[in-house]
Amino acid sequence: RSAYALLAQAFAVNPEPRKRHFMVGFTLRNTLSEFGTVSRGICETDADSLLTEVVERTDILPAPGGKARFTDADGTVHPLTGDEIASMNCWGFMPSIFDELGGLFEEFLSRRGTEMKSEFYIPFAVSELSHRQKISVQVLTSTDSWFGVTYREDKPMVQKSIRDLVAGGIY
């Protein structure tokens, strides 16, 4: 719920309504499953908390002490602090983004439109628009736990978390 409050506050004081967009990121350690690996878009930002890159990491596992690790394509294991900001695709876009995304989508279709399994990933499109200086995305950070069902075994925890939020009057 705090993610929506963060977005509402940011929209209320948006310094560049045509160009500035928002993304709520979550602390990586608060997005992991204890039942297996996950993939997360790890966000890189500048000193002003503006998004500079979303790097997709796969095969992320929790590690002791709130840390994490991922394995790259060649099998090398890399440590993560757990403090990294993960994109869970909680975006706050101004309407102007859709003209920009439309142009990128046309480029995508001309390059990969005939591939059966090609996908137009919003985080990659946003990174590309940012690199082209068409938009800026301010990263807002939520310290809430993010929960979802990545594995069947996650379901009871998610159900309990939702019940707890309802019982606590949060939802």
How would you name each of these model-derived features?
Residues S2-W91, P95:
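Conserved core of the sugar-phosphate nucleotidyltransferase
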